Amino acid sequence: MLRGISQLPAVATMSWVLLPVLWLIVQTQAIAIKQTPELTLHEIVCPKKLHILHKREIKNNQTEKHGKEERYEPEVQYQMILNGEEIILSLQKTKHLLGPDYTETLYSPRGEEITTKPENMEHCYYKGNILNEKNSVASISTCDGLRGYFTHHHQRYQIKPLKSTDEKEHAVFTSNQEEQDPANHTCGVKSTDGKQGPIRISRSLKSPEKEDFLRAQKYIDLYLVLDNAFYKNYNENLTLIRSFVFDVMNLLNVIYNTIDVQVALVGMEIWSDGDKIKVVPSASTTFDNFLRWHSSNLGKKIHDHAQLLSGISFNNRRVGLAASNSLCSPSSVAVIEAKKKNNVALVGVMSHELGHVLGMPDVPFNTKCPSGSCVMNQYLSSKFPKDFSTSCRAHFERYLLSQKPKCLLQAPIPTNIMTTPVCGNHLLEVGEDCDCGSPKECTNLCCEALTCKLKPGTDCGGDAPNHTTE
């Protein structure tokens, strides 16, 4: 009896000692699950990685790439319980997320340009869907646990790891953002020179050559420039910036893969020491300044389209401006407001402006798309814009057939294995301004068929109308 009584204070004392420890654990968990005005904690899940037998695994019991073991598998599946229901995230590694010659450019405090080609840039970004749920989408990073975005039964979720592993507790959030008021987010069209008329197509739309062009896999080499305000918004932390930008690129591919277009990031330039142009609240002025800078810096990196992501707010509720029908040309640029650290909202604007570059117009606010939100909607929405409307797909097809932007057919390949350019083969290659075929075939008034250079005195770039998104 005495022993039992004497133990009570010890037990009580131990309980009081444990309470602060438990409270510390709870506090640590609460800090890890940081909610925002846009996101509300939905529940905690524990993903379980399922084993998938790959063809390469059957062959040699390992996944290899150029003789080296690949850290991230080409396909993964994760099972979890969400809302009391078992779901399986079925994910495929995003192809061509980064170009093989991907570079990063920063500037020293003295303004010296420092360009590097980061080593070991094997990425961990995947896209996919909920297994057996047709209209679901997923964009997930598996670098340190599962982090990203997915939809399930038309509800948008974000998932974040509580620990740096993919099979421990993860927080799942739901979005609180409501649909934006159409009156506050309008989209207009501004023509700079007005020289480019409506797209015209020949009557023989369905010739074998054109059918092949439409069916071919298409690629866009994207070059991103981040202004000084963007750099400071991320505390000048390159790791944070890189993670955010790669998340956005993965989401961008989720969207553009629906029209068989792969978007590869071939370069990221950060104006770390100060802006190289005057970045002002007028989107139109900033666009003109960026276009001039871009035209004088074309030799920096081979790319098809460039976007400036700005950390400031533009006037009049505008969030983007792009040159229409301009892919593969020196005027293929856009400026994007990227002040808010919201990857879904940012990719909505980036994908919209890229659509204008590919010949797509705005569509009315009430246009329906399978996911409920169209990429080219004239008003911005908080929903992830997964789809292109039927009319936009038709405009894209007309743009392809009338303009035949050859750079779209070039898959990203390392420059050190590029073949010698051949003028007259209809392919835009390194060192060529244009390639319209042989002198007999060429119908491009701007292109010198014998040299594949633009003719002197021609004004074939910079005259595309601009689309502004507000």
Curated annotation (Swiss-Prot):
Cofactor(s) the protein needs: Zn(2+)
Annotated Pfam families: Pep_M12B_propep, Reprolysin
Cofactor comment text: Binds 1 zinc ion per subunit.
Localization, UniProt: Secreted
Domain Peptidase M12B: 218-412
Superkingdom of origin organism: Eukaryota
A single MF term (Gene Ontology): zinc ion binding
Keywords: Disulfide bond, Glycoprotein, Hydrolase, Metal-binding, Metalloprotease, Protease, Secreted, Signal, Zinc, Zymogen
Propeptide, residue positions: 31-205
GO BP: immune response; negative regulation of cell adhesion; proteolysis
InterPro entries in UniProt: Disintegrin_dom, Disintegrin_dom_sf, MetalloPept_cat_dom_sf, Peptidase_M12B, Peptidase_M12B_N, Reprolysin_adamalysin
Glycosylation sites: 61, 184, 237, 466
This protein's name: ADAM DEC1
EC number: 3.4.24.-
Disulfide bridge partners, by residue number: 328-407, 369-374
Gene giving rise to this polypeptide: ADAMDEC1
Induction line: Induced during DC maturation and up-regulated in response to T-cell signals. In macrophage up-regulated by bacterial lipopolysaccharides (LPS). Up-regulated by 1-alpha,25-dihydroxyvitamin D3 during differentiation of primary monocyte into macrophage.
Active site (catalytic residues): 353
Residue ranges annotated for the Disintegrin domain, each copy included: 420-470
Residues engaged in binding Zn(2+): 352, 356, 362
UniProt cross-references to PROSITE patterns, sorted A to Z: ADAM_MEPRO, DISINTEGRIN_2, ZINC_PROTEASE
UniProt GO cellular component terms: collagen-containing extracellular matrix; extracellular region
Organism of provenance: Homo sapiens
Record's function text: May play an important role in the control of the immune response and during pregnancy.
Entry comment describing in which tissues the protein is expressed: Expressed highly in the small intestine and appendix, moderately in lymph node, mucosal lining of the colon, thymus, spleen and very weakly in the bone marrow. Predominantly expressed in dendritic cells (DC) of the germinal center. Weakly expressed in monocyte and highly expressed in macrophage. Absent in immature DC.
First and last residue of the signal peptide: 1-30
Residues covered by region (Disordered): 173-200
